[in-house]
């Protein structure tokens, strides 16, 4: 009997989460460095090239419940503007998330624009301001909702009412993010770089963000601070430090780590680079990462080893994440190749 109740009780817990004041955690990825727009729209364009396209897929909690599946697709196009060393990045992010037995789904379509102001005649120091905003829709499959009201005294009875009434099974809203970043070369070596950024997510505080349509429910703004440092170790090797700190209401998250990288061929213009390292999501997971660049493409694979209170139930298993990226210069007069020196992250 206890086994028969696990599924409805689990679904009931998920349902409770859906009916709260939308204080749930935003979509996030362990390979956060492959989703720059999601971190901070002012990080758009901070790469070597004119165009960058990135796709990330995450599959989580297979060992505990119905898998949580999340996907991200983003694109950026960078071009010089004016007669100085400034440039502009146009881009966008599409997110899809499906979670749990009630098939809670979210779709985000978010165009972005970022302006990069040059602070140096050497074209190696920039202050960037970015905005991203668009449409978000969330939905559930009410036919898959089960609760303990469907327990008839002897077992689970799907013919009984769930006892829950939703005014709507989907809702949508507009969402906006603003951010700033500072990026610069470190010292005389053009390969050594740093960036710092801060972003304010959900600045418009969208209301009625619940399946009950309650106007008192609103999105809680989120602050995200970002850091990236890239330093040469030798002619053939370098390391990259990356970190994010997020705060949304009472929820905080710290994610940080490093990648060690080896150039596998020409040291000046390597086509093949192998990266390996690990990240820590504080009190939640250790995340080993491997990445291979074969320019203009790159693929990365990571895995979350669970450290949280779910570790006994999940046997330490978390989620697997895969990413594919493409970036290069384009042979056009408005290319940024000769106009800027971008951090080589």
Predicted regions span which residues?
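Bacterial N-terminal signal peptides that target proteins for export
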Residues: 2-12
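Subset of outer-membrane beta-barrel
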Residues: 25-345
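Hydrophobic alpha-helical targeting segments used for export or membrane insertion
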Residues: 13-18
